[in-house]
Amino acid sequence: MLSDAAKALLALKSLGRHQSGSEILASPEKLSALLSLSTLYKDDPDASSEALRCIANALLLIQSSRETFLKPPVNGGEICLNALEKSTNPEQIFVLARILFLSTALLPDYIVTFIENKHNGRPVVEIIGAKLDLLYICVLNSTRMAKEAMTDLLKFAYNFIHHYPKAVQENPQSQAAEEDEKKVLGDYWSPKLDGLLPPLLRIFGSLPPSFPNPITPPLTHVIHALIGIPVSPSLKNVWFPSRSAVNSPKSAPQTPHSDHRSDSRCGSPIMQSPPPSARPGAFDRALSVLSAGRRSFSRCSSPHVSSNSDILHRAWDLLEVAFNHFFADNIDPDDPKVRELLKDSSDNSLDALLSPLVILITRLCQADETSRARLKQWLVPDDLDRESPLEQRQDMFGKSLRLLTSVYHNRLKDSVGEMLYAMAGSDASNLSTLIGYGNAAGFLFNKGILSAPPASSSTNGDVASSVRDDINPITGTTFKPKPNLPEMTEEEKEQEVEKLLWLFDRLEKTGAMPADQNPIRKAIQDGKATLGP
């Protein structure tokens, strides 16, 4: 049963769900009082949680209260970070993460303060990493509020990835970042955030997928965070640990930050990712991950989740399962049935749901030659059957090509185009060689490449191995021998000419074609053709 304090704070929270109620709670005095109550009733989790939920409601409804909460005399950000560092209860972590996410979403200056200072002697990045590893174990054990807590903690982490590098502008990731005054995600990076990458990769590589759509929270928020972290030379051994482990016999899988606190609610399984091997079906691979996660409950007293996983393999598996769910067989991506499947999703468009995962794969391929070669072999293997139109295939290659002509899913269309372009080494000629210029033309036109690219002298061996002399450069399919048809008779030729004359005359009369652009009229005026014998 709830204590009297919990009941009173529950009633206060109910009043704070309305704008007028939250306006009263948003004053410095009320926010400080609620923080004090959450600390005073630390041995009463229900009462402490209700006090924090009152604050969360006020921050959500009264935007001006967010800065009030962070600055003196409240100093709520520091108090909540210290509480987060100590907490092992998913319900309390959820509310604390929600408060910290809301209070820092639009205030990047305080993000800098959080990064530069330590909290209970620990950097905030280390605290977030430890809590993510703890919550991963809780998610595997289906602990109440574990998924929600991880989702909001990931949102809080994303605020750091989004705001801090732009605020300090330490390491520009491209020439455009230095020249463009408008800074966007990925233009800059700070080594102080490097510690976020290992726990994010551990969760991305091991979190059991959902079915039939595998891209659901908190996995969606992991992907959003990952695409904001550069695949830079200094971080490549973290992005691709299995590769560095092979190259360096002394290297070992990186362990997560130990929290030195255990909670019987969560358990603490060990989760090891197997090395990449032959590729079974995507659905079978996803099921095996889910089964492995369930078998691993409560094996030890401290979380140990290996980050030695294949990030590209995992991302491609998830995309393959998602594409097979939304674009079954060879359905048109713009078919209304596709949009019907989104009714059960938290996202209202495939652009928002799938584009981030495609962007993650693209960034891996842009930064890593091995990833490009692997993606090419999965999408366009050397022994690809090119007898039938490529865009009619039922596999991932065909689905990707059909998306290039989508009208309804513009962001996803562009993202898939960039992924194919990265797979081809960011070379228009290589892309046209692999998928046919007819399939690539629309994407290349939007990139400012307005004509068919010439054969590239830099075509790499992987692309060259996919090219055969009998492949049509426009369709990407093999040439078919022309049937031996009899020559047209003179009478048939005259009939075809009459059809052309009639068509062009009709276009001219309807105003669709100016008279001076009629090719038949021009030919007659130039003496190159006559109307009759």
What are these regions (language model features)?
Residues 2-13, 42-60, 86-108, 140-165, ...:
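Alpha-helical solenoid repeats of the armadillo/HEAT superfamily
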Residues 132, 327, 379, 448, ...:
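Generic secondary-structure transition motif, activating predominantly at the C-termini of alpha-helices
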Residues 1, 126-148, 166-184, 195-217, ...:
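Acidic, Ser/Thr- and Gly/Pro-rich intrinsically disordered linkers and low-complexity segments
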